[in-house]
């Protein structure tokens, strides 16, 4: 290990850190002190030298310290990127190289600064910030996001499942769930005000009342889990299957009925469908279809076939006086 100060120029910095297959000690941590900024304008590649410092794998980058690190070149390293503290700013496409796992610790921030980046898996702790900031983050193998996602831009899930539990109310971009991928959320704050383009699977796990205000489109499937009620309106534009596994899905209200565009709606044994409007496709009922909402004469329109699988249809009637 050789100490590198902020006064080193780029040539000396790259020489001392030994990123590019030189035959000396290598070290993958950038420790930037509070109020200091270090801009790395050279490309970082895997270090194949056997002489690596303190167990460094020669291909991973760690950002520590409360200062700011800027990566302003397209990089080629293939290991993990870990932001332990402070801020890491991207200033080039794929500035994180071909990162395997991206870790954000509590108190750390990654600012994508308008640039695209592809990684394998995202892992963020509560108290961290992922600022998409007009950029595009592509996940090939999902991950777990307990921190905050903010800004605009796009977060694309190409494979695996991304489980979001953080408060993302300041994210106004787009979640894209591609075929074979899965996005799981539990509260309105998990989605922020983002659009969702779903071509895979979206799980909405509501344990309490949730008015879904996000625009959701695509031919992917939507799964409703959790005992809470999910109220949807005309912003629900998906055409894939809707699977009500637990809890209730409420279509619109008396003044604004909703025709759900799903080609297939399945009400499971612990599920319920109610509200005003109908479904464009087939309806399979093993649970409850509740037409008792608010007033006698409520109508549920089914555009396809209705199949009862030991499910109940609840009706509200009125006798003449």
Task: Label every PLM stretch briefly.
Residues 10-101, 132-190, 197-265:
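Extracellular repeat-rich scaffold modules on cell surfaces
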Residues 31, 108-114, 203-205, 274-276, ...:
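Short aromatic-glycine motifs in intrinsically disordered, low-complexity regions
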Residues 34, 134-137, 222-223, 239, ...:
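Extracellular beta-strand/loop-rich repeat segments of large surface/secreted proteins
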Residues 62, 125-127, 150, 285, ...:
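Extracellular beta-strand-rich solenoid/capping regions of secreted or surface-exposed proteins
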Residues 106, 115-116, 126, 197, ...:
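Acidic, glycine-rich low-complexity segments
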